[in-house]
Amino acid sequence: MRMYDIIQKKRDGQVLNESEIKWFVEGYASGKIPDYQMAALCMAIYFQGMNLEETAALTFAVRDSGERLDFSEIQGLRVDKHSTGGVGDKTSLVVAPIVASLGVKVAKMSGRGLGHTGGTIDKLESIKGFRTDIPVGEFKEIVNKTGIAIVGQNAELAPADKLLYALRDVTATVDSLPLIVSSIMGKKLAADDDCIVLDVKTGSGSFMKTKEKSRELAEWMVEIGKRAGKRMRALITDMDMPIGYAVGNSLEVIEAVETLKGNGPSDLTELCVILSAHILNLAEKGDLTTCEKMAREAIANGSALQKLVDMVEGQGGDSACILNTELFEKARYSCTVLAPTSGYITGVDTEGYGVASLLLGAGRNTKEDVIDMTAGLKLIKKTGDFVEEGEPIAILYSGKESGFKAAKDRLLSATRIGQTPPPETPLVLAVVE
């Protein structure tokens, strides 16, 4: 087999067979296939797509490219929740502690920032001392002891995806349905969780801009997960504006902590309660109404916050900053963005907000970039709010002043102001089982 022939075949819109897919995944993971050929194939897949059978074969090849975990030593049912990526999406930092506090084991492997979206691992690393690179044996011990751990993708786990993930990030091939499905599910299926709930984002801040594309993504992931013997569910949720008010790394951790203390933004709190309820329901803790009440109670009685403290301490982090968020490192510089005119914020290009955060240093433009954990933005006004001309709509934060102008311009160009308030959009648009 030759990589050239596989690239040509997909470039011309033909269907790749299972052996071809396994061959190029194994070849790329072992270093025999160079980046430039894999980048060409990713672009061919981006334009020509893959059918469900090809995507399932790619997913299983990614899963089988390295070690497959055995979580049988972890007592009880094991669950995972995964988001397809959004702006200001810190839900895992809230949902995982809620679920774990209610007796369901959370053994979660998360990713780093991809494109304009932030990654859970980058966010957690803004906590002083927090370790995300933990050996599998220790990971299982932590989950057994505390009921929860969130770690970075193990180097031995789906190594093909780790390489593809970094390559897609810098070659404009992130938002491809088969590449997203195989990346997410390849990793998820290499781990040994019993139940997986997927938070599939739709709208301007997601990789899937339309509800139709998001539903297709959800249906394919649920189907491939079921083929692998997992209990699956997907929620299609709105990403036409950031979740909560904070976008960035430490800024989002602080907002997640405040949510667990019962002081979070209403949209973030509601979405986290709904996601938690679906996970608990899939884990047979009760019907959805009962599970929703349990999730709210876990926030109200402080048990979910305590579970986050347990996780941070279990992974070597300084839990003092969870109990007192003033201890997080602050950005050296800030800049207030003012409304250019009066009216209602009728909508935003959420991806533009994510790009503004990137320009401030909160994400990566190349694989080697170092993230400024303090960088990002805090919204003062959101979609549906009325603003007066000259009133603050956001505050930008960064360790360098040089990114402020570009970030401010990007944020303003992504904000639409009109004279009529927009209709309200539900947080959850559909459930796929």
Regions found by a protein language model. Give the residues of each.
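Acidic, glycine/proline-rich low-complexity segments that act as flexible tails and inter-domain linkers
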Residues: 1-88, 307-314, 428, 433
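Well-ordered secondary-structure scaffolds
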Residues: 5, 10, 15-17, 68-69, ...
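Alpha-helix C-terminal capping segments
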Residues: 47-48, 93-107, 187-192, 227-228, ...
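Self-splicing inteins and homing endonuclease
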Residues: 59-83, 136-166
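Glycine/serine-rich anion-binding loops at beta->alpha junctions
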Residues: 77-100, 104-116
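Short beta-strand segments
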Residues: 109, 143, 151-154, 184, ...
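A glycine-rich helix N-cap at a beta->alpha junction
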Residues: 123-149, 219-225, 229
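Phosphate/diphosphate-binding glycine-rich loops and adjacent basic-rich segments that engage nucleotide
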Residues: 144-195
